[in-house]
């Protein structure tokens, strides 16, 4: 056939020309976009196939189940986010880094975490990814607390224990702020900052005075979740 008589390529044939890594990346990013609008529980393999523009069987070639796929999507987003977070924190002084990490994150970012917590009880692969990245977050905060104490700005007999405590406080406040809307942004930050200052022996008001921008909430490029109602 010459060029004029050759049929145009289909979406599936274009997908077939992509590398394995490119196909997998497309599928994961499409899943994240769907999670942003439908939640983890609302995503099906057929939805993802339609979003990517491929046949259903191609999705199953890379992910044996819906549970495996949504876990991979969450894992990809958080791994990308935390890598960016670490780079940002490393460029800040210790006190500003602490304030940046503890600052309330954008609503669209935390709603995905809250939705993941809700779905994890029914999706073991997602629960495993959630647990792994929760520990990653605790380790990042532990490192920041260690930097604060090493600079002589605060005290901590056990940075890891203080990290677990402050992570629990920040998560609880985030639920009340983002999911329940019973406290506003200023109050949410004030609660977490005040408890952190007391726990670490910091000068009262020092975290707010650091005037930080949130260090978290930068999802993977082209897959940033949009706000949705829970």
Describe each region flagged by the PLM.
Residues 1-15:
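Short, intrinsically disordered or compositionally biased N-terminal tails of bacterial proteins
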Residues 23, 66, 73, 77, ...:
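Hydrophobic/aromatic residues within well-ordered alpha-helical segments
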Residues 23-26, 30-68, 72:
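Helix-turn-helix
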Residues 26, 30-37, 84, 112, ...:
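Solvent-exposed, amphipathic alpha-helical segments
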Residues 64-68, 89, 107, 121, ...:
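Residues in soluble alpha-helical coiled-coils and helical-bundle/repeat scaffolds
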Residues 72, 82-111, 162-166:
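Hydrophobic alpha-helical connector segments
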Residues 106-131:
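Amphipathic alpha-helical segments used for helix-helix packing
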Residues 127-131, 135, 148-222, 228-230:
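Hydrophobic/aromatic-rich alpha-helical bundle segments in the mid-to-C-terminal region
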